[in-house]
Amino acid sequence: MAEEEKTELPSAKKIQKAREEGNVPKSMEVVGFLGLLAGLMSIFVFFIWWVDGFSEMYRHVLKDFSLDFSKESVQELFNQLAKDTFLLLLPVLIILMVVAFLSNVLQFGWLFAPKVIEPKFSKINPINGVKNLFSLKKILDGSLITLKVFLAFFLGFFIFSLFLGELNHAALLNLQGQLLWFKSKALWLISSLLFLFFVLAFVDLIIKRRQYTNSLKMTKQEVKDEYKQQEGNPEIKAKIRQMMVKNATNKMMQEIPKSNVVVTNPTHYAVALKFDEEHPVPVVVAKGTDYLAIRIKGIAREHDIEIIENKTLARELYRDVKLNATIPEELFEAVAIVFAQVAKLEQERQKQKIIKPL
């Protein structure tokens, strides 16, 4: 039997399970673009500070070399240079780490997945490694990198060719003018490349999300199996509901002998009312239609409960009053008439009991 095609979108449960395993849609092009953007902005922000810092380091080197040129002093000097260079670059390194972290958070939210670091044989299996090397995902990633390099080179060459005509004019400028000319062209080139990398990152993000969705797609059978696991087998749930309805019905039927009257339609509706010292307002203790109405009337006859026909009241009680709830105020008068009928019937029955022995 051929394997069923995966045509269904992944469920929320499958996506959550994939997240717990560290499987999330992630575009390294987005991370790289935001990192590049942050790096360039950091250069503009810290450029003057770097110039001052590296100038001070240069003066310090010349001063130390002029005083002493021993092995120990040179080693100490290089240690100091490494320390000063690290401190100068530290703010940018921190910014790049924060941007890399946030660029991932923006793509797939906060995520803690310990399963990612768990050792798995499949990760070191050379056969799987070869398969992954020639997978569609790797081919697309490689193609995008090649396209990125080609487009960047082509764009740079195109922009540089536009500048060639201005080189003769720029050569006639003074040093300050040449620097300003070079700065404007450099900003133009950088802006163009950033726009290109932004477009490529956006395209890569769409591709990665589509690949992610396709990798998690499910067969129709998998969807059914997952539904059964989450919601339970529909047949079993139906049986449980039937049992619950049956138990509720049996409990309701047990309350009928405690009622004072059953109001009927007469055939389609039956509502049992209870009225005593504990219930100063009549309460609906049982109600039903059709077959259930017949059962209610049958139990009422078995226990000598009065059955009063009132079509309008029976329908209103069934429709508007919940089980074990008191009747609403607007039905007080109609229900009072019913209980008056019940009282009259009981009086007549008592008279018959008295007259009968005579």
Swiss-Prot record:
Keywords: Bacterial flagellum biogenesis, Bacterial flagellum protein export, Cell inner membrane, Cell membrane, Membrane, Protein transport, Transmembrane, Transmembrane helix, Transport. It is a multi-pass membrane protein. The keyword Cell inner membrane applies. One of its GO terms (cellular component) is plasma membrane. It comes from the Bacteria. The keyword Flavoprotein does not apply. One of its GO terms (biological process) is bacterial-type flagellum assembly. The chain crosses the membrane at residues 31-51, 86-106, 144-164, 187-207, 323-343. It is found in: Cell inner membrane. Belongs to the type III secretion exporter family. Required for formation of the rod structure in the basal body of the flagellar apparatus. Together with FliI and FliH, may constitute the export apparatus of flagellin. This is Flagellar biosynthetic protein FlhB. It comes from Helicobacter pylori (strain J99 / ATCC 700824) (Campylobacter pylori J99). The lineage of its organism: Bacteria, Pseudomonadati, Campylobacterota, Epsilonproteobacteria, Campylobacterales. The gene is flhB.
